[in-house]
Amino acid sequence: MMARPGYRKFHGFKSTVFGKSIPRKYLLDYAQARELAAEFNTLVEDGGIGLLIGEVGIGKTTAIRAFKEELGERSCRVCYVGSVKHSTAVLQDFVLQMGYQPSHQRANLLRQLSKAISQTWVEQRKKTLLVLDDAQATEESLLEDLRLLSNFDIDSQEPLILLLVGHPSLQNRLRKPIHLALWDRLRMLFRLEGLSLEETHQYIEQHLKAAGGPVELFTPEARVAVFEQSQGIPRRINRLALEAVKRSARNKVNTIDENMIAVAAGVFDGV
């Protein structure tokens, strides 16, 4: 049996702390997350195309995962492609998730996807949500294919919902003349921002709770220092806080203060 990492044993954590994902019940419930959830729900209800943007590590994928879990398979079929791939590979991935054996020809893939979306609506009365993450790196031709795919309707309903997710540069890209037809069809545009100071306090506490550790491990001053170094970006918070936790265990220190945060930040030359 693999031994627990030293910090888990020293601080009494039951699981990894400040990891990439935590159980949904521990996700921070804050104003911006609630606003985004409302936008997601409206998009699914009304159909159409949505755009979610934010800096690297801001929590876009986490927000999508939480919404997908909440949505389940009740009224919508969700297909997610999250890594940068060639446009044909993206379409093949979507087709495979819809339950079809994907073709090797692009035109056939679009027909397969269109048929699967229509069939899901007609037979199950379920819409299909296609989520394309890291869309800022997507080929121009794929964006156009997805726009054309979203054109059809059945019984005055739009059975396809398309959600593009990416860096802020994606918004500028979609506003170029080549993609204006897609831009004009957007029904949702949401930019995810970093956490506030108070939200950063709560975020740290939620992660400590999720791992079963001491919620007072970080002093108030340390939490302020984490916020200042990370700018409230969750991935940076996680990296900095975990480094501080590991160092505190190695030094057999039961409380993390702002000085330890400064040392931890130096490892990454800031975060």
Regions inferred by a protein language model and the residue ranges of each:
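Conserved AAA+ ATPase "SRH/arginine-finger" region at the nucleotide-binding site
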Residues: 81-83, 174, 187-200
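AAA+/P-loop NTPase substrate/partner-engagement loops
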Residues: 72-97
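Short regulatory helix/loop adjacent to the ATP-binding pocket of P-loop NTPases
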Residues: 68-70, 170-185
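Walker A/P-loop nucleotide-binding motif
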Residues: 45-66
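A short, basic N-terminal segment
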Residues: 1-46, 266, 270
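C-terminal alpha-helical "lid" subdomain
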Residues: 2-6, 65, 181, 198-205, ...
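Mid-core helix/loop region of P-loop NTP-binding domains shared across ATPases and GTPases
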Residues: 8, 86-93, 101-145, 153-158, ...
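Short hydrophobic/aromatic beta-strand immediately N-terminal to the Walker A/P-loop
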Residues: 50-53, 80, 131
